[in-house]
């Protein structure tokens, strides 16, 4: 490197260090084509794109290419590879970075940054076995590591062969690290004993927008008795990401606070100042959670519900809301929280005011039997692929796949498709549908299907409610814990126990049998919608009363 190039590199380093990303990009652009610059200049330029929050996908893909060039010019420059991995989590494009990371890992098997990066890539691609194996390797090397642990713990819900005992053990280990970090045992904060005029209830979530959580939550918020309860929404969603549903929720609540920019300490202080009777966490280990806030006592009573259907393992989370289809009484020791049972179902769906028509003609005119699964692609486990493959190979059928997640792109879809093809399924039998932005258009897609196949061990929830609402029955698998039994509870609440499979063999048998039934359209379709809309699945009025009673009992007990 010449003296001039060194001076430029030092200048660009200082700009990067001072977060002057646009200035850095401007200075480099003035030098001419980025392809003609020194590797270090390329590295700083790409880093400025990655670190700038406003960078668009096209820019991020350029940054990835530049990091790749720098790494290939010097295989020992691992920071460029680390950065390329980090960019891939924003673009969800892994086809180039994964082979490079695996090759580097062969030479650097103890590099924890590579281990974590590859584990997370496998997580996004739905390769649960590989992901969990690498995460375990990472935490064996770094047992006290807290940062970045959420994908590992939450991924245990997606993988077959992970028992509830094993899941709880990992939760307790993670929770103990967080509790030790904040010295929970010696937190002497005392709440104000002054009684609130109404029962003061707050819900914290990053999903107060067009999201499954809000579609379930809105019905409760609309109907809960505001003369008894003061309802406050704590939004961990960036203000720029709020939408029409966010604003609708704002209007229904007594108070709304945007806290995405709050530090954990500031948020704990703020929540405690509200003197809440009850704080609901609607996130668990999912994206946008404030786990390290919930781990500290922020309200007199803290409850987990709706957004995450399993234990979190922390001492300061008092209750987990379920129903008796989800958790058996002899399983209470497998959940850190005390279990609160709602009498019928643990949540209820608020359907759109105007539902699309159920059009059976399209199904009748199709000689090929059509299965569908509109679940998040990451729920399609290897076990699910194996079972579905058996069904597809033994029937004249096709499978429609679609996800409501905007972030799921080609690499994940291609990975799923490869798994089916490797199982002997014809490429033509797997059809990926485009994501529909409008809920009405999304629901109409169910008219293309005869029956919905549920994923396992992580079943669909929103998609099952939607399918049934559109007259499409759902074949689900018997589960072993709260999360994996959600499909069971849904089917039991519409008295369709016959569509709960006992095991893999039974699942295949039931699916194949369904393709041979001639009167499916008379049994399901419009009759199923009518049955469902009058069932506990959509009975918001009764659900809210049961929910209110539960809250009053909790406050009285406290």
Where are these regions (language model features)?
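Short Ser/Thr-rich beta->loop micro-motif in glycosyltransferases that lines
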Residues: 283, 454-460, 478
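Alpha-helical solenoid repeat scaffolds of the TPR/TPR-like class and their adjacent stem/linker regions
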Residues: 1-368, 424-425, 437-449, 463, ...
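Short hydrophobic beta-strand element within catalytic cores of glycosyltransferases
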Residues: 473-482
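Short hydrophobic signal-anchor/transmembrane segments that target glycosyltransferases
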Residues: 71, 220-227, 382-396
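Donor-sugar nucleotide-binding helix/loop cap in glycosyltransferases
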Residues: 453, 467
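A conserved nucleotide-sugar
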Residues: 228-232, 389-422
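Short alpha-helix at the nucleotide-sugar/activated-sugar donor binding site of glycosyltransferases
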Residues: 468-469, 492
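Active-site donor-binding acidic/aromatic loop of nucleotide-activated sugar
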Residues: 258-260, 412, 428-438, 456
